[in-house]
Regions:
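Conserved alpha/beta enzyme-core scaffold
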Residues: 1-434
Length: 434
């Protein structure tokens, strides 16, 4: 291998110079979540007149996302594979797109021969080690595949990016252009946990046994669950994300990862999202490893851990057990993310469980989230064939192996009391006596 330090020096340029190098690109992507380089995305928008409908395909962003605004639609067309607050309007408009996909498949989509093969990848990584390897730091997921397979790779070298371990490195020789800029990493503070989420979290935690391996999704409910696990022993983590709450349980000795069949003694994830406390803890820490999403979220891999428990949120559940976790008010709100990946992996696991958890109502109690049937056009995220446990603040419904009539009865019992009679009437019309 040639002297990487000399190669490094020859690749240094400004953000604007780097964007000039991709003026002929047709499709690009960014590092996921906190691996997105704001320095580079801002330079992209600043040089927007170089482009004509450049496709920007990626998942969640915590940046400004100005490339997704209507005022820039002449230059960029945003293609969301998962939708966040800053890209939601574009994804539901004529000037943007949404591509349905399971999270574990995104690495393949961005592969060399994938349906979304890239002309360029823009991201931020850690400073190189003595051998010239940079860590992806905060997001390995599809970011690694996209970086390895894009025609041009532009990376911001940022000393604030933690050096996370695992299958999570890129060599300087595989980066085409380098921007040296140290910018603080965006921090995502945990959501506020209310009384309803607290009750749901307590029910979820009651299904977790000592020695189980956990996956927890995003939101207030997973945070609430973590608060009720402090009396458990030897829990493990194999999850698409690691948050601050997981670090707290590691420090308490609750999470040891000792009982895992796969990757024992290590917490496995594909991205990190939280505060500086999390980033500092993960830095050069062999207790946490990041791996690509086609490993971490692959249901076949997930199932290799016995007693795998997945806990994910939802927007609605109908009386057949179908789950909507991505669609609100006739609009695409988010995406399936890794929910289906882990629902299937957990239920395939020996002794595994899948939990879908949601408050019983929304709209300040005026709308039931347990519904007779979905409105026309609402997509099914997790099918009725995959669903296992559903939990609200009113209890636990175990649906696996149950008939449609039995499911309806169980789900009505955990619906908000104000809506149970209406749901019973509709269920009676379909099924007769429950």
């Amino acid at each position: 291998m040639k002297n990487w330090k000399e190669s490094y020096k020859s690749k240094i340029c400004t953000p604007d110079e780097a964007i000039q190098k991709i003026k002929d690109a047709k499709r690009i992507s960014f590092g996921h979540i906190c691996s997105e380089s704001s320095i580079l995305t801002e330079a992209l928008v600043r040089n927007k007149k170089l482009f004509k409908k450049l496709e920007i395909a990626h998942l969640l962003s915590v940046g400004k996302s100005e490339y997704a605004k209507e005022e820039n639609s002449e230059y960029f067309r945003h293609n969301a594979l998962f939708i966040g607050p800053k890209t939601r309007e574009a994804a539901n408009s004529s000037y943007g797109d949404y591509t349905p996909t399971f999270f574990f498949e995104t690495a393949k989509l961005f592969g060399k021969d994938g349906e979304l093969a890239l002309d360029a990848m823009l991201l931020q990584v850690s400073t190189p080690d003595e051998h010239g390897y940079c860590s992806y730091g905060l997001s390995c997921d599809y970011t690694k595949s996209a970086t390895e397979n894009a025609k041009i790779v532009i990376a911001q070298i940022n000393k604030f990016v933690p050096r996370t371990l695992g299958n999570c490195f890129v060599h300087i020789d595989d980066i085409d252009y380098i921007i040296e800029e140290d910018t603080p990493i965006p921090e995502v503070q945990p959501p506020v946990v209310g009384e309803i989420e607290r009750k749901i979290g307590e029910f979820c935690a009651s299904l977790v046994r000592d020695g189980d391996t956990l996956q927890l999704g995003i939101g207030a409910i997973p945070v609430a669950v973590l608060n009720f696990l402090k009396d458990k022993k030897d829990l493990g983590i194999h999850s698409e994300m690691i948050s601050d709450g997981i670090v707290d349980l590691i420090n308490l000795g609750v999470i040891t990862n000792k009982k895992k069949n796969l990757n024992p003694n290590k917490a496995i994830a594909t991205f990190l999202m939280g505060s500086k406390k999390l980033y500092d803890y993960a830095n050069d820490n062999p207790a946490i490893e990041l791996h690509p999403v086609d490993y971490v979220n692959n249901p076949i891999i997930i199932a290799q851990n016995d007693n795998m428990v997945s806990i994910n949120s939802a927007i609605q559940v109908d009386l057949m057990g179908q789950v909507n976790a991505e669609y609100v008010d006739s609009k695409q709100f988010s995406g399936p993310g890794g929910q289906v990946d882990f629902v299937r992996g957990a239920t395939m696991s020996k002794g595994g469980k899948s939990i879908i958890a949601l408050p019983s109502t929304t709209g300040k109690g005026t709308i039931s989230r347990i519904v007779f049937t979905f409105d026309e056009g609402v997509p099914v995220t997790t099918s009725r064939n995959d669903v296992d446990y559903v939990i609200t603040e009113y209890g636990i419904a175990h649906l696996r192996g149950k008939t449609l009539r039995e499911r309806a009865k169980l789900l009505i019992e955990i619906a908000h009391p104000n809506f149970r009679e209406e749901l019973r009437k509709k269920a009676f019309e379909k099924f007769g006596e429950l």
